[in-house]
């Protein structure tokens, strides 16, 4: 019942192209020492791309905060990520600068985040999070481009009454478990919203998850629209099966074994399903 998540739109092309050119630079540039890594990254963005940024390195994570005009579009109180050509190029430049530094650093970086605001849209910001191993794998053609984008966390936040608190969004030694929860929650949500079977009759809300004491827990938020039919037992079972297939695929592709089980909760019905790790692998799609 779950459709494959749609590919990221064409507006990411400039960012992708900047990544592709970097594979020629990887391993050839200078080594960036940890004490100066954040400062070198800021200097690179300012001098080569004329874009002031603020970079922070905490533990093994890098966060870059920047302002890019034209990144967001506001219409009647609604905000969407719709960068202009120039804004997309600037975002790609930030990505390129980060990769040039972290892939040549003398200190292992696990994750990086870009937190970008648009001066024309106060109260809104976009956060992009990536795992460095995914970056290396896409450079080596070990994963396809579409899969790389699916592994990228891209969240848009909008609260005109609450300005951006940089301390709240800076990465603090993110774990792989946390990253996988964020990624799988977003992929589940996108998959349900792309499923034509549910598009007309049901509202798909945010799918949220957590990893706690060896258990991955996810809430599937799917409610019938006003006057619409409740989900049948067969539909609920199909939703759970599809969710488990997606979760199994992601964890298998990351070779992640440090968990005991997966638990699903459907909102608003309250129906649940749990499977141990050994059974989860039976939900892996069969090779075509």
Regions found by a protein language model. Give the residues of each.
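Surface-exposed acidic loop/strand-edge motifs in secreted or periplasmic proteins
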Residues: 71-83
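Post-signal peptide N-terminal segment of mature Sec-exported envelope proteins
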Residues: 36-58
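Polar/charged, Gly/Pro-rich intrinsically disordered segments
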Residues: 58, 63-74, 103-245, 249-288
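C-terminal motif of bacterial Sec signal peptides marking the signal peptidase cleavage site
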Residues: 24-27
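Well-ordered, non-membrane alpha-helical segments in soluble/globular domains
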Residues: 38, 80-101, 232-248
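Bacterial N-terminal signal peptides that target proteins for export
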Residues: 2-15
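Polyanion-binding and phosphate-handling cores
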Residues: 32-35, 39, 87-119
């Amino acid at each position: 019942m779950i459709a494959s998540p749609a590919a990221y739109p064409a507006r990411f092309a400039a960012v992708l192209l900047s990544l592709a050119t970097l594979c020629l630079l990887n391993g050839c540039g200078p080594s960036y020492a940890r004490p100066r890594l954040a400062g070198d990254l800021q200097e690179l963005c300012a001098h080569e791309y004329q874009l002031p940024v603020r970079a922070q390195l905490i533990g093994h994570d890098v966060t870059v905060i920047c302002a890019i005009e034209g990144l967001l579009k506001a219409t009647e109180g609604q905000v969407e990520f719709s960068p202009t050509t120039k804004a997309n190029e600037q975002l790609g430049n930030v990505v390129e600068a980060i990769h040039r530094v972290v892939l040549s650093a003398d200190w292992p970086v696990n994750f990086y985040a870009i937190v970008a605001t648009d001066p024309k849209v106060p109260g809104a910001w976009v956060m992009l999070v990536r795992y460095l191993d995914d970056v290396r794998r896409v450079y080596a053609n070990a994963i396809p481009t579409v899969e790389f984008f699916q592994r990228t966390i891209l969240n848009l936040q909008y609260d005109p009454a609450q300005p951006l608190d940089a301390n709240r969004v800076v990465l603090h030694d993110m774990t792989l478990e946390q990253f996988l929860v964020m990624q799988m929650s977003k992929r589940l949500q996108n998959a349900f919203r792309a499923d034509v079977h549910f598009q007309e009759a049901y509202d798909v809300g945010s799918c949220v998850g957590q990893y706690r004491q060896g258990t991955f827990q996810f809430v599937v938020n799917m409610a019938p629209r006003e006057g619409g039919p409740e989900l049948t037992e067969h539909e609920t079972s199909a939703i759970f099966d599809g969710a488990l297939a997606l979760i199994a695929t992601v964890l298998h592709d990351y070779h992640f074994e440090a968990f005991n089980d997966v638990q699903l909760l459907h909102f608003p019905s309250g129906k649940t399903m749990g499977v141990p790790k050994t059974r989860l692998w039976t939900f892996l799609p069969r090779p075509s």
